[in-house]
């Protein structure tokens, strides 16, 4: 019987006999004495086997990396000069008396302590990958976060209620994963993109405070922070306004960070959406980076420089500057790389001015400003740019000029890139936790492709008080009772006050060009139940995967999920998704127009 975990044996167990079980992390033969580092989920302990115990010595001699062993022995101090203060077990070792080989192991595809393994190799051999200490730590922290959330919400009076995994398809922005019904041929369930409607119905049912930690599914193009199946900390409350909900969930975030990382997050400032977009080009600004946009659209309306003037005069156009302290030292190569980078976001180029001498702001050859564009701008404009940005000698000013969406995304991404690469050494990046709330989101945004307004969050978000009439008369300026929790440039949670009156919900659907017939067909069960005395209610959902990714400092969300999918939505461990046989398809009344092999060949 195991008496101790390997990584938890300390000096308090000196001279005691212990039994540990685990994997051979490393084996060394030192002139007739064998050393084995035995590993389990709690860490590593050093085991010494000498020839005086011949059976144990023979077992140790046959063992190789990743063999599974049971070892019984006496705990003793390590010899002087061989201790490791970074480990709980670093001052002791076990002198083995008995060793049992519980299982042999094939040679693993990579060493457990090898940090230079490609992600494809890791995901194909995920079980071995999960033995690595960093992965063990990540998933243990994930567990701690989930348990901390449960403890906090339980104490706040929330009830854990499960909602269905098989439900109806309702449009929420991304494509649904569909599940064909065998019992109802030609009909489909959908895996939920969120428990949104069910949690609202639980409020109508009178449960007052609900939560669950649940899987959600979205069939969308994947990025570093997205998975087709992801875990959501979902909650909903009745009779609370947005300030009260934000206070509760802010308290939860603070408690979780304190318990898991011993970090005090402090208070969360609140920033209107319009301010976030104006100064940072993003609704999830990374406040560790002290760089802001400077608005120049008005100034460029009277300039002759076509690139800036064209954007300033364009409907929905924008011209901004981004001052980077000490950036004049950027090389031509670095600026070219930044130009390519903003091109990813649709920018056609990246204009810049290096500030060498603020005392000479002419646009002539002797100008204190260095740039190909200086000669195209008036001296008045140059002086105004320097004044507005507060630029000093040695700075560089980057410019964005295009549709506001392109400018915001391109220069916003540049702000992050420059800030992370150069901010620490130049004083405009602080490596700390910077949370905030972004509030006062627009209710709708215009979808040029669909030629109509769509919901920014989802169509069940309530309009800001006094904005109900704007939903139809001026949807572009209608604000929502929505709020996002942002941490270091990541949206880790988003929520809103919901619509609790059927007539208001019908007006929102109408503003989104959803006909009464379509409303009833897709959302009739919601509209019908809102008529039975639905309480005012609202909530929030946290992305558990994103939150843990931030807390661990992992490079990818895939590093905090036990068995994730690739960016092509595949599981390399099990080779899912996979083809199914014709019999299974016939049972589901399905016939494929194109076989999987044909699709891959095409």
From Swiss-Prot:
Annotated function: Aspartyl-tRNA synthetase with relaxed tRNA specificity since it is able to aspartylate not only its cognate tRNA(Asp) but also tRNA(Asn). Reaction proceeds in two steps: L-aspartate is first activated by ATP to form Asp-AMP and then transferred to the acceptor end of tRNA(Asp/Asn).
GO terms of biological process kind: aspartyl-tRNA aminoacylation
Self-association state and partner proteins as the record states: Homodimer.
GO cellular component assignments: cytoplasm
Localization in the cell: Cytoplasm
Residues binding L-aspartate, per UniProt: 172, 218, 457, 498
Positions that bind ATP: 218-220, 227, 491, 543-546
Coiled coil stretches, renumbered: none
Pfam family, one: tRNA-synt_2
NCBIfam families recorded: aspS_bact (TIGR00459), PRK00476.1 (NF001750)
Species this protein is from: Neisseria meningitidis serogroup C / serotype 2a (strain ATCC 700532 / DSM 15464 / FAM18)
Catalysed reaction, written as an equation: tRNA(Asx) + L-aspartate + ATP = L-aspartyl-tRNA(Asx) + AMP + diphosphate
Family under the similarity heading: Belongs to the class-II aminoacyl-tRNA synthetase family. Type 1 subfamily.
Chain residue ranges for the region called Aspartate: 196-199
Annotated EC: 6.1.1.23
Site feature (Important for tRNA non-discrimination) residues: 30, 81
Any one GO molecular-function label of the UniProt entry: nucleic acid binding
InterPro entries according to UniProt: Aa-tRNA-synt_II, aa-tRNA-synth_II, aa-tRNA-synth_II/BPL/LPL, Asp-tRNA-ligase_1, Asp-tRNA-ligase_1_N, Asp/Asn-tRNA-synth_IIb, AspRS_core, GAD-like_sf
Name recorded for this polypeptide: Aspartate--tRNA(Asp/Asn) ligase
Keyword annotations from UniProtKB, A to Z: Aminoacyl-tRNA synthetase, ATP-binding, Cytoplasm, Ligase, Nucleotide-binding, Protein biosynthesis
């Amino acid at each position: 019987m195991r008496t101790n975990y390997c990584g938890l044996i300390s000096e308090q167990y000196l001279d005691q006999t212990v039994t540990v079980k685990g994997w051979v992390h490393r084996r060394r033969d030192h002139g007739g004495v064998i050393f084995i580092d035995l590993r389990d989920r709690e860490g590593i302990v050093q085991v010494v086997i000498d020839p005086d115990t011949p059976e144990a010595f023979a077992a140790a001699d046959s063992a190789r990396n990743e063999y599974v062993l049971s070892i019984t022995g006496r705990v003793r101090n390590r010899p002087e000069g061989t201790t490791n203060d970074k480990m709980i077990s670093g001052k002791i070792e076990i002198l083995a008396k008995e060793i049992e080989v519980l299982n042999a192991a094939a040679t693993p595809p990579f060493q457990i302590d090898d940090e230079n393994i490609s992600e494809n190799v890791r995901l194909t051999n995920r079980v071995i990958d999960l033995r690595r200490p960093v992965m063990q730590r990540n998933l243990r922290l994930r567990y701690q976060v989930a348990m901390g959330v449960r403890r906090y919400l339980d104490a706040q009076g929330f009830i854990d209620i499960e909602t269905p995994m098989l439900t109806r398809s309702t449009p929420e922005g991304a494509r649904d994963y569909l599940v064909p019904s065998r019992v109802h041929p030609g009909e489909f369930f959908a895996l939920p993109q969120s428990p949104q409607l069910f949690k609202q119905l639980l409020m109508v049912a009178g449960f007052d405070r609900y939560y669950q930690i649940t899987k959600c599914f979205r069939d969308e193009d994947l990025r570093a922070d997205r998975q087709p199946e992801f875990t959501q900390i979902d909650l909903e409350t009745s009779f609370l306004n947005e300030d009260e909900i934000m206070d509760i969930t802010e308290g939860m975030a603070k408690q979780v960070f304190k318990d898991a990382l011993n970090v005090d997050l402090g208070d969360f400032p609140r920033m209107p959406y319009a301010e976030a977009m104006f100064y940072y080009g993003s609704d999830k600004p990374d406040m560790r980076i002290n760089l802001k946009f400077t608005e120049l659209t008005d100034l460029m309306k009277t300039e002759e420089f076509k690139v800036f003037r064209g954007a300033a005069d364009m409907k929905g156009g924008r011209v901004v500057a981004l001052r980077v302290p000490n950036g004049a030292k950027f090389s031509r190569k670095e600026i070219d790389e930044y130009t390519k980078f903003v091109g990813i976001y649709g920018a056609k180029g990246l204009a810049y001015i290096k500030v060498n001498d603020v005392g000479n702001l002419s646009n002539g050859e002797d100008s204190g400003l260095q740039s190909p564009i200086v000669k195209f701008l008036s001296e008045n404009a140059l002086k105004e740019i320097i004044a507005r940005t507060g630029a000093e000698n040695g700075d560089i000013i980057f410019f964005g000029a295009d549709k506001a969406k392109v400018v915001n995304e391109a220069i916003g991404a540049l702000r992050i890139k420059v800030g992370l690469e150069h901010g620490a050494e130049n004083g405009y990046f602080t490596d700390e936790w910077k949370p905030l709330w972004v509030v006062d989101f627009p209710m709708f945004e215009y979808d040029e492709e669909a030629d109509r307004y769509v919901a920014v969050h989802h169509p069940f978000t309530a309009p800001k008080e006094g904005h109900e009439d704007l939903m139809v008369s001026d949807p572009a300026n209608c604000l929502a009772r929505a709020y996002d929790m942002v941490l270091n440039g990541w949206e880790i949670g988003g929520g809103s006050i919901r619509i609790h009156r059927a007539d208001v919900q019908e007006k929102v659907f109408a503003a989104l060009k959803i006909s009464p017939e379509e409303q009833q067909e897709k959302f009739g069960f919601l509209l019908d139940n809102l008529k039975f005395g639905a309480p005012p209610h609202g909530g929030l959902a946290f992305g558990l995967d994103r939150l843990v990714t931030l807390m661990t400092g992992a490079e990818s969300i895939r590093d905090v999920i036990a068995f994730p999918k690739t960016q092509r939505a595949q599981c390399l461990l099990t080779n899912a998704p996979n083809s199914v046989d014709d019999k299974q398809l016939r049972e589901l009344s399905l016939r494929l127009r194109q076989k999987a092999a044909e699709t891959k060949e095409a």
